[in-house]
């Protein structure tokens, strides 16, 4: 799951190397890229996300946790 999220980040963000605890917005993310990220994650993992959730889980590790939570419900 983490590898897939990293691949999505690499596709969307200009900085191609990411730490698991790097913040999406600190790495060049913005509201438009956030919408694309949300779409990619929803399609890749068959879940529904709210854009507001990304502010609580702004890292790759956090997003993996969020996806796992969504998939378990």
Regions found by a protein language model. Give the residues of each.
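Phosphopantetheine-dependent thiolation modules in NRPS/PKS and related acyl-activating systems
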Residues: 1-73
């Amino acid at each position: 799951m983490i590898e897939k999220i990293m691949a999505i980040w690499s596709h969307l963000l200009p900085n191609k190397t990411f730490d698991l605890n790097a913040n999406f917005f600190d790495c060049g993310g913005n509201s438009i890229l956030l919408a694309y990220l949300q779409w990619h994650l929803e399609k890749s993992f068959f879940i529904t996300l709210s854009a507001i959730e990304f502010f609580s889980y702004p890292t790759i590790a956090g997003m993996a946790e969020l996806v796992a939570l969504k998939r378990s419900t």
